[in-house]
Curated annotation (Swiss-Prot):
Terpene synthase (mono-TPS) involved in the biosynthesis of monoterpene natural products included in conifer oleoresin secretions and volatile emissions; these compounds contribute to biotic and abiotic stress defense against herbivores and pathogens. Catalyzes the conversion of (2E)-geranyl diphosphate (GPP) to (R)-linalool. Mg(2+) 2 binds at D377, D381. Belongs to the terpene synthase family. Tpsd subfamily. It is found in: Plastid, Chloroplast. Mg(2+) 1 binds at D377, D381. It is an enzyme of class 4 (lyase). Residues 1-21 form a transit peptide. Keywords: Chloroplast, Lyase, Magnesium, Metal-binding, Plastid, Transit peptide. InterPro entries: Isoprenoid_synthase_dom_sf, Terpene_cyclase-like_1_C, Terpene_cyclase_plant_C1, Terpene_synth_N, Terpene_synth_N_sf, Terpene_synthase-like, Terpene_synthase_metal-bd, Terpenoid_cyclase/PrenylTrfase. It comes from Picea sitchensis (Sitka spruce). A motif (DDXXD motif) lies at residues 377-381. Its cofactor is Mg(2+); Mn(2+). This is (R)-linalool synthase 2, chloroplastic.
């Protein structure tokens, strides 16, 4: 196991007292008629309570502090976590089950004339692959999955497929599940196959009676529609139709495994879905209803393995989380009153997308660099003065420990921790890549800091840029690039320069991801940021460019833009015959999904008491009952 081991700061740079020693704290609120009003130090809005506080430090400087809620996860609680699932007996049982499940998968390729026939062999293969992937155990069966999908693809044609290779007619369920699964694995499949399932009026043909089979068919159509490429009109039509159908079905059918599956898929879709969260949900869905697989023995083996794998990884998560919490506490960050303390939440996101135990360096690196990025966000957006920000920006570009000496006391520890973390991650990456990658990281960090500096100047001067100018800078300041670049270099996957350029800046994938996340974040953080005097957002800039528009118009425009960009991102990630394998792009794409998940209903960076807290509990703190 390769941990990113970063020692605490040297005593000359570490600040072990409060980073904010205030003489006067005065709450300030801005009155925004369309968004809410202030009451007793809080800005009341429909979605979030937020205001900022003017704080005068011992140095006499008045600063702004956003009233973010404190850390929810006490270090003593984290250090007290324990689980037995790292013991040898559980590991040995899991290894035995892996062998038995491989036998089950291989048995599907053997026709027995009863359960596996030429009339169902395709859907049987697709179903086992789909279930293995959704249960989060697919890393053990890469060869078996490829063999199954190669077989299915060999019978794929311009009309899709039937349930089996000798089926006379094509089947919507098999075709929808087949298109989704094959496309996710890089096979070239066209969405035109769905045209034949539409009636003359353009609507998809479907029985008026919502049986389990009919509902399952439409559910797979919906899942397939979410990985649409640009220009695929039939996929847009499929998404609209299936969304309406499934919502109506939820109102009619009783609460059961199928209804829970529908509710989950409708809520999280694909871009907000996280592999470990899906596995946790699907373990319950899949294990309670045998309709999901033909053989009960197969169901039992898969479920037992999925539960064991979940809990074994859970034991590793707790050890890594203890490391993260100690790092946060020992480094002095716990004393920073002005910053958002979201290290536990960031680790949770990392461990929900990188569920291979071998990727410890990725999880820890992502956690630390994104936490530090959030601290910088709070310094540049609210706490730092313009003179201090200029000093910090210059220090980052100088990149030397001595550069910390000219910084304000509260900045010294932040700078040194950034310096140590980035350098340590570069050393970790060098072990995997066989070359020094520090220059890549420094270039990304400098671009990140420059974008922050530009936004700070906008805030200070009251300047409101055009929408295009704002987004061009905002897609960098979101921090997707610094949160992605160094962590993926520690995965053990080779990233030669020409491959890295297709994922990192200036690639289209990187550009799209940064733009999507910036715009998605603006929709949920706009009100709170405006209450703190931060006028620049995609919504404000759009309204400036279009004086007759309303906030609702701006949100509608931005949502439509996000949907269009997501389709482009799907293409960049999944396009067949690419020079860059999907496996090389997967974690960069999954990092987008992690950030996107934070903005599902609110600004999850700032407010983590609700959905994100539940995510931590269900995927990191609690194990699955066996």
């Amino acid at each position: 196991m390769a941990f990113v081991s970063i020692a605490p700061l040297a005593s000359r740079c570490c600040v072990h007292k409060s980073f904010v020693s205030s003489r006067e704290v005065k709450p300030l609120c801005r009155t925004i008629p369309t968004l809410g009003r202030c009451r007793r130090g809080k800005t009341v809005t429909p979605s979030i309570s937020m205001c900022w506080t003017a704080t005068v430090l011992d140095d006499g400087v008045q600063r702004r502090i956003a009233n973010h809620h404190s850390n929810l996860w006490d270090d003593s609680f984290i250090q007290s976590l324990s689980t037995p699932y790292g013991e040898t007996s559980y590991l040995e049982r899991a290894d035995k089950l892996i062998g038995e499940v491989k036998e089950i998968i291989n048995s599907i390729s053997v026709e027995d004339g009863e359960l596996i026939t030429p009339l169902n062999d395709l859907i049987q293969r697709l179903s086992i692959v789909d279930n293995i992937e959704r249960l989060g155990i697919d890393r053990h069966f890469k060869n078996e999955i490829k063999s199954a999908l190669d077989y299915v693809y060999s019978y794929w044609n311009e009309k899709g497929i039937g349930c089996g290779r000798e089926s006379v007619i094509t089947d919507l369920n098999s075709t929808a599940l087949g298109l989704r699964t094959l496309r996710l694995h890089g096979y070239p499949v066209s969405s035109d196959v769905f045209e034949q399932f539409k009636e003359q009026n353009g609507q998809f043909a479907c029985s008026a009676i919502q049986t389990e089979g009919e509902i399952k068919k439409v559910l797979n159509l919906f899942r397939a529609s979410l990985i649409a490429f640009p220009g695929e009109k039939v996929m847009e039509e499929a998404e609209i139709f299936s969304t309406i159908y499934l919502k109506e079905a939820l109102l009619k059918i009783p609460v059961c495994s199928l209804s829970r599956e529908i509710a989950y898929v409708l809520e999280y879709g694909w871009h907000m879905n996280l592999p470990r969260l899906e596995a946790r949900n699907y373990i319950d869905v899949f294990g309670q209803d045998p309709i999901y697989l033909t053989l009960n023995m197969r169901t039992q083996k898969l479920i037992e393995l999925a539960k064991l794998e979940f809990n074994i990884f859970h034991s590793l998560q707790q050890e890594e989380l203890k490391h993260v919490s100690r790092w946060w506490k020992d480094s002095g960050f716990s004393q920073m009153a002005y910053a958002r303390h979201r290290h536990v939440e960031f680790y949770t996101l990392a461990s929900c997308i990188a569920i291979d135990p071998q990727h410890s360096s990725f999880r820890l690196g992502f956690t630390k660099i994104t936490y530090l990025g959030t601290v910088l966000d709070d310094i540049y957006d609210t706490f730092g003065t313009m003179d201090e920000l200029e000093l910090f920006t210059a220090a980052v570009k100088r990149w030397h420990p001595s550069a910390a000496e000219g910084l304000p006391e509260y900045m010294k520890g932040v700078y040194m921790m950034f310096y140590e973390t980035v350098n340590e991650m570069a050393r970790e990456a060098e072990k995997c890549q066989g070359r020094d990658t520090l220059n890549y990281a420094r270039q990304a960090l400098e671009a990140y800091i420059d974008s922050y500096m530009k936004e700070a100047k906008w805030i200070s001067s009251g300047f409101l840029p055009t929408f295009e100018e704002y987004l061009d800078n905002g897609k960098v300041s979101f921090g997707y690039r610094i949160g992605t670049l160094q962590p993926i270099l520690t995965l053990g996957i080779p990233f030669p320069h020409h491959i890295l350029q297709e994922i990192d800046f200036p690639s289209r994938l990187n550009d799209l991801a940064g733009s999507i996340l910036r715009l998605k974040g603006d929709i949920h953080s706009y009100q709170a940021e405006r209450s703190r005097g931060e006028e620049s957002s995609g919504i404000s800039c759009y309204m400036k460019d279009n004086p007759e528009s309303t906030e609702e118009d701006a949100v509608t425009y931005i949502n439509a833009m996000i949907n269009r960009l997501l389709k482009e991102l799907n293409w960049e990630f999944l396009k067949p015959h690419s020079n860059v394998p999907i496996t090389s792009k997967k974690h960069a794409f999954d990092i987008l999904r992690a950030f996107y998940h934070l903005y599902k209903d609110r600004d999850g960076f700032s407010v983590t008491r609700n959905e994100i807290r539940n995510l931590v509990m269900t995927t990191v703190i609690e194990h699955v009952p066996l």
